[in-house]
Amino acid sequence: HTTLNADFEGGYGGRTRNGDLDYKEKRLAEGITFGEGDYYSRDDYDLHETYFQGTIGFDHKFDDKGHQLTGSFYLKYGGNAMEYFQSDLFNKNNEREKGHRAWEDEHRWTVRGNLDYIYPYSKTGRLEGGYQYFSYLEDGDYTMHFWDPQKKEFYNRDDIYNTFYFQHGINSVYAIVADSYKSFDFQAGVRGEHTHRVLRSSIPGKDRTYNKFEFFPSLHLGYTFPKEHKLLASYSRRITRPELFFMEPYITYRDFYSAEIGNPDIRSEYINSFELNYKKNIGEHTVSATVFHRSRKDKIERLRVPYEAGVTLDSMANVGHDYSTGIELSGQVQLTRWWNVNLNGSLYHYQVKNQYKTG
């Protein structure tokens, strides 16, 4: 039995936001005030695009015992995508003292595809395997205009203008085997991923190409004791990839006191997680305790440094490794048929080993 499905959509969409901030500024040097005033800021943000997207898929069932093959393909195009930001700083006389306008004009492609196979080889066991693909592409440019208080007009910042191209693709295959025997059950899996990333910019020295193949194993073991006591042990290795704006190598301004710049050399975070869980059902109530240890390599954090007078510059960096070890306790009490109470608590030790060096 085979089922096919398709869905197509197109339209125009976006979102906006605005904000107002009141400032009272006072500048001192060696205890002497040299600048003071009241200001208010008006910020506006707009993001819109014309988009077309579609999904096609199928589901083939070989029998009614869970033996099946499924697949899908998704494509989205965002054209004439414009991300616009403006900010103006006025004094108490309603005169503009600072201002900027920023345009990020681009088109975007998103592609996802998957093929998944499940084979129940016995009443309790199954094999799973599949292939997945993901790709995201942005191509566009970034422009900024700043306010000139002497000429009372905006001017283009040629030193900030930037063209960019970003493509991120992930090919992955995975396999899982799961089974149970009497009171024992297990699930073991492995995922192989090839990551391809291209970053191109008109800023000299900021082009990057990245290719890497990696494995991510996981293992889950469980044993059920008499009287509904259950013990679970698990291990997994995971990855957290940096967001695109973490890597964009050009300066953007969020307001007049905060600027940001991406780090094209930022690396992914890798997490190794070990857990041992005990669970007990007492009638309709449940109690559980989990002992865990988690380590993270190449921890990503936001760093802030001075940039210009009164302006800070934020960027992202891999600052080192962190570790957390502890216990989590939880309980669920079913007071009535329609009312239950959940209680949760944790106690852990957290450690960071900072390896980031500033030059």
Predicted regions, residues:
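Residues on the lipid-exposed face of transmembrane beta-strands in outer-membrane beta-barrel proteins
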Residues: H1, G10, G54-H60, G113-Y119, ...
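Surface-exposed extracellular loop regions of Gram-negative outer-membrane beta-barrel proteins
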Residues: H1-L4, G10-L28, D38-Y40, F52-I56, H196-V198, K227-S273, H293-A317, ...
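Repeated loop/turn-to-beta-strand initiation elements of outer-membrane beta-barrel proteins
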Residues: T2-L4, D64-L69, T124-L127, S183-F186, ...
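Transmembrane beta-strands of outer-membrane beta-barrel pores
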Residues: G10-T16, H60, L75-A81, Y133-L137, ...
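Outer-membrane beta-barrel transmembrane domain signature of Gram-negative proteins
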Residues: H100-Q187, G222-P226, S330, K357
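Outer membrane beta-barrel strand-and-loop segments of large Gram-negative receptors
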Residues: R101, T110-N114, R157-N162, N263, ...
